[in-house]
């Protein structure tokens, strides 16, 4: 998997005109007086100092546990930077397996009449939010924020797990100094992985931890037989020894901010980060256990998990319904579609992710609600029951990132995949307006992994192989200096899905507001929407539009914008270069056929020339053709994007094509009196 962020670390000596003290509580008057970041004067805030420490501690009877300690000091320059004063720390919290946040303290510093004043973070600024059934966001909001404030806070996370969370090395604001340290007992071997273009390297050293380790049985180091991280002691006999720590440190200055660009799937996918994959555990008895995995290992481990497999294979609760919905159907693909549509209507998604069931498939079926695992493992079971070759496809949602190596921990979602006649059919029954091979937006994230009971697996593309189409037809004429138009739009596939998801329960007034172009003077009326509820059809719209701003009378000549209020007004791609891909979401075709009646007594004296622009490798194209036919101005415009993701090396070509689009769509037709 290729990432497109290049992290350039440059040392700027003498850039900060004062010596900073990085100890907690030692905020200086000079830091408070600083009006803007010397290197990034437009930033709303800067991390002055960030420290992130990971270590493992031995506790008799419990084994090793992980402790994470974080300290951050942030300078806020503008009110727009106040969002950095609210911090969320995600911790695992499910049943008896939980991480605990503690030792939280923080202060806000302000300069008042030349004196440094500080205000303590109080309990009324600390609160928790449940993210899902497995994670909590421990949040706190710093008090008395002002432009010019400096905030600092520190906290610890106690974790019973050996897995080390990904360590972010870059934010959307600059980081002036960052220190990372990991102290890892010699028994635990990790593979350190970074974004391929994030130029980082850790210094390495060793020390001796003077702690006696008493080992009971084979699992005494805090690794369970299946899930690494949880302590399971047992057996007879014991031994003791001290151990050494492997120490990894990173100390960097002036880390640039992650640039916010338009059309990005998930900006966090491209930030610099350090990933630590548990590869092996060697306990003092010398019995190694490997955790490095291939995709075959991942597949085997999932199919060995009873909580997953038993739910996927459970089938006694739906058989009467299954018989009814497949009655009279002989074609396997018809059975597949019938079952898929039934599950979509039967069980509603509770907004919780995860490829493991939450309520259990039977309970979800009976109560009509469940998480992603409940719904789609149920779907797989029903498809298998009618002898379709259905298996799970694991994936990571856009918000969860992209797995860099074979792992089951990088996935947070499961869909159904059916292999039939050398074709693969993907289905997600949690999304009522999706369809076969048309996944919801949250699930279209690079590749998934189809896993089979025989231990084999394969990568699966999650983007559709065909374009979604939107077609717009306009009949217009100029009446009393105002362009009056009748518009018909047909939205297919993902265009229809997105419209339904946004407006299915909305009144017409909300839909009219959604149709109005931003910063355009357009009145829309008489809106009719057909097939909004029918997932198998296009969404069809028709409405009347009045647009006075698209025509201008200058000295008796009429200057008309033939694209009306559909013109692309500005190029979304303004940066000179780009470090990450352009994400369009899915292939699409956007086509306009516009017919404008030439006013009586006028003739066309200037008409925009046609163009045809193409991106290389058939990634996309743009066609514009205007002509005068039988008293009408006829305009045909089509934008086609065939690649849902266009790599950063092709950015300049995309930018150039959109420059042409903006220029062409804002050209005028000139009408003069005949």
What are these regions (language model features)?
Residues 1-24, 674:
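Bacterial Sec-dependent N-terminal signal peptides
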């Amino acid at each position: 998997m290729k990432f497109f962020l290049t992290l350039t670390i440059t040392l700027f000596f003498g850039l900060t005109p004062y010596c900073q003290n990085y100890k907690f509580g030692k905020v200086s008057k000079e830091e408070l007086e600083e009006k803007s970041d010397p290197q990034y004067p437009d930033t709303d805030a800067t991390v002055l100092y960030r420290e992130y420490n990971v270590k493992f501690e031995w506790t008799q009877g419990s084994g090793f546990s992980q402790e994470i300690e974080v300290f951050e000091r942030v300078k806020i320059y503008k009110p727009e930077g106040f969002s950095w004063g609210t911090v969320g720390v995600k911790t695992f919290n499910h049943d008896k397996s939980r991480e605990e946040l503690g030792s939280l303290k923080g202060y806000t510093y302000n300069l008042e009449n030349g004196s440094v004043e500080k205000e303590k973070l109080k309990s009324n600024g600390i609160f928790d939010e449940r993210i899902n059934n497995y994670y909590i966001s421990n949040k706190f909001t710093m008090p008395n924020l002002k432009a010019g404030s400096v905030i600092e806070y520190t906290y610890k996370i106690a974790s019973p797990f050996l897995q080390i969370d990904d360590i972010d090395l870059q934010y959307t604001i600059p980081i002036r100094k960052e220190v990372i340290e990991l102290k890892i007992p010699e028994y635990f071997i990790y593979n350190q992985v970074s974004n391929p273009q994030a130029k980082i390297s850790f210094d390495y050293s060793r020390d001796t931890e003077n702690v006696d380790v008493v080992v009971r049985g084979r699992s005494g180091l805090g690794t369970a037989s299946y899930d690494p991280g949880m302590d399971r002691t047992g057996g007879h006999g014991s031994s003791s020894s001290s151990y050494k720590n492997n120490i990894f440190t990173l100390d960097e200055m002036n880390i640039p901010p992650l640039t916010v660009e338009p059309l990005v799937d998930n900006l966090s996918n491209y930030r610099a980060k350090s990933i630590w994959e548990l590869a092996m555990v060697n306990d003092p008895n010398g019995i190694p256990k490997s955790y490095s995995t291939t995709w075959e290992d991942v597949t085997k481990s999932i199919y060995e998990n009873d909580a997953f497999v038993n739910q996927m294979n459970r089938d006694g609760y739906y058989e009467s319904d299954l018989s009814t919905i497949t009655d009279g159907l002989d074609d396997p693909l018809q059975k597949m579609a019938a079952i898929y549509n039934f599950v979509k209507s039967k069980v509603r998604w509770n907004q919780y992710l995860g490829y493991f069931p939450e309520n259990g498939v039977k309970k979800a079926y009976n109560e009509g609600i469940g998480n992603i695992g409940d719904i789609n493992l149920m779907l797989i079971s029903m498809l298998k029951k009618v002898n379709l070759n259905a298996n799970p496809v694991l994936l990571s949602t856009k918000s969860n990132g992209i797995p860099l190596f074979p792992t089951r921990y990088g996935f947070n979602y499961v869909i159904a995949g059916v292999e039939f006649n050398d074709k693969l059919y993907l289905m997600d029954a949690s999304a009522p307006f999706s369809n076969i091979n048309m996944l919801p937006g949250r699930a279209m994230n690079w590749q998934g992994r189809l896993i089979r009971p025989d231990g084999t697996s394969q990568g699966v593309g999650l983007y559709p192989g065909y374009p979604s189409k939107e077609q717009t037809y306009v009949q217009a004429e100029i009446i009393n200096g105002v362009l009056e138009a009748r518009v018909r739009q047909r939205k297919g596939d993902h265009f229809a899905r997105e419209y339904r998801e946004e407006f299915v329960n909305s009144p017409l007034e909300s839909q009219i507001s959604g149709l109005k172009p931003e910063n355009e003077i357009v009145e829309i009326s008489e809106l009719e929407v057909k097939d909004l509820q029918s997932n198998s059809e296009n969404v069809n719209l028709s409405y009347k539009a009045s647009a006075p701003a698209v025509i201008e009378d200058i000295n008796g000549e009429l200057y008309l914008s033939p694209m009306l209020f559909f013109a692309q007004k500005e190029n979304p791609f303004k940066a000179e270069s780009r470090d990450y891909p352009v994400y369009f979401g899915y292939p699409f075709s956007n086509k306009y056929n516009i017919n404008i009646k030439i006013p009586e007594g006028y003739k066309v004296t200037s008409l925009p020339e046609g163009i045809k622009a193409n991106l290389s490798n058939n990634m996309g194209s743009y066609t514009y053709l205007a002509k005068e036919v039988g008293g009408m101005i006829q305009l045909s415009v089509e934008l086609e994007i065939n690649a849902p993701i266009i790599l950063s090396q092709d950015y300049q070509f995309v930018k150039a094509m959109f420059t042409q689009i903006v220029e062409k769509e804002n050209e005028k037709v000139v009408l003069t009196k005949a």
